[in-house]
Amino acid sequence: MAISTLKTGRIAIIGASGYGGLQLVKLINEHPDFEISTLNGERSVGKNWNEINPFMKILGDKKITKSNIDEIALDSDYAILSLPNGLSSQLTPLLLKKGVKVLDLSADYRFKSLDKWKEVYTKEAAKYKRYDYDLCEEAIYGFSEEFSSEISKSRLIACPGCYPTASLSLLIPFLKQGLIESEGIIIDAKSGTSGGGRNPSEQLLLSECSESIRPYGVIGHRHTAEIESIASHFAGHQVNLQFTPHLVPMVRGILSTVYARLRDPGLTAEDCKIVIEAFYKDQPFIDILPVGTYPATKWVKNTNKVMISVEVDKRNGRIVLMSVIDNLLKGQAGQAIQNLNIMHGLESDIGLPKITFYP
């Protein structure tokens, strides 16, 4: 019996030359149900993909083109936008009008209020004029494990940021069930250098970041507002928390450690582990580790997994939650494909890696 090779979803990747775009190309090229219809990238217009990326050759090769909405609409069912903040909002309304469903990797539609986005992304708001209040309200936040029903019916997905994905995966089960105090939450997170993108940057030079770790964006990091927005949704009231990111000398990976006060100080680490296991039951990308086993970024490298561990400090009634993700996969392109699978009526884990190469 012949095996069907028909691919049913045509995907345009807009912004294919950055790290996020590279992951998308690899994942879609190897996906059993999707094919790459269009590759857009301002840096390499007119060049063949396989010519400039000999380490990631794709079947049939593709010429990188400028974004043309009419051409994308003719060739594509979905567009995944891996663009700088602000720029996505200039293309998304046009794509949606042409009937192309959009998954946006930027922060442009992560807030239900456009005014809130303008408050957080002030430089981008000054550069790009936006009036798409209705689309901000319509967009579904692409935290796949919690919003899959809404994602399946949506035409516009706002894919979460990398730090929010790692941190919210810990907070949501406990805020939604009222098991932790919403005041005094602290998030300490560490990310590899690929989180800074592919453009040259002095602070990401090997001689600058090797053998060194440093905090950045200590007060007012943009992901603070995103985390607070979603955390408040699940808590049912405003959540104000402390979030501090750190740059560590590795290429990919995020470790997020969350500290919060338990409402019931009698809960044990085993009790809290059961809470997380029940909340994420049957979710293929969430792994809950045994109490006393703490996650390492290498364990999820090159996968779409989230690994979670929990401890309880009986001295002060605090819960300590830990998660690791690959910032370029579960924190970016992998979660986008997970959402794309859901939108297309597939199992969420189709075509996504679950097991790392180790060491």
Swiss-Prot record:
Entry keyword set: Amino-acid biosynthesis, Arginine biosynthesis, Cytoplasm, NADP, Oxidoreductase
Location in or out of the cell: Cytoplasm
SMART domains in the record: Semialdhyde_dh
Main location: cytoplasm
Catalytic activity: N-acetyl-L-glutamate 5-semialdehyde + phosphate + NADP(+) = N-acetyl-L-glutamyl 5-phosphate + NADPH + H(+)
Enzyme class: oxidoreductase
CDD domains: AGPR_1_C, AGPR_1_N
Disulphide bridges, residue numbers: none
GO BP terms in the entry: L-arginine biosynthetic process
Pathway info: Amino-acid biosynthesis; L-arginine biosynthesis; N(2)-acetyl-L-ornithine from L-glutamate: step 3/4
Amino-acid biosynthesis in keyword set: yes
InterPro entries given in the database record: AGPR_AS (IPR023013), AGPR_type-1 (IPR000706), NAD(P)-bd_dom_sf (IPR036291), NAGSA_dehydrogenase (IPR050085), Semialdehyde_DH_NAD-bd (IPR000534)
Signal peptide: none
GO cellular-component term (any): cytoplasm
Superkingdom of the source species: Bacteria
Pfam families tied to this protein: Semialdhyde_dh, Semialdhyde_dhC_1
E.C. number: 1.2.1.38
List of catalytic residues: 162
Family membership noted in the UniProt record: Belongs to the NAGSA dehydrogenase family. Type 1 subfamily.
Function text: Catalyzes the NADPH-dependent reduction of N-acetyl-5-glutamyl phosphate to yield N-acetyl-L-glutamate 5-semialdehyde.
Annotated NCBIfam families: argC
Protein's name in the database: N-acetyl-gamma-glutamyl-phosphate reductase
UniProt source species: Prochlorococcus marinus (strain NATL2A)
Lineage: Bacteria, Bacillati, Cyanobacteriota, Cyanophyceae, Synechococcales
Gene behind the chain: argC
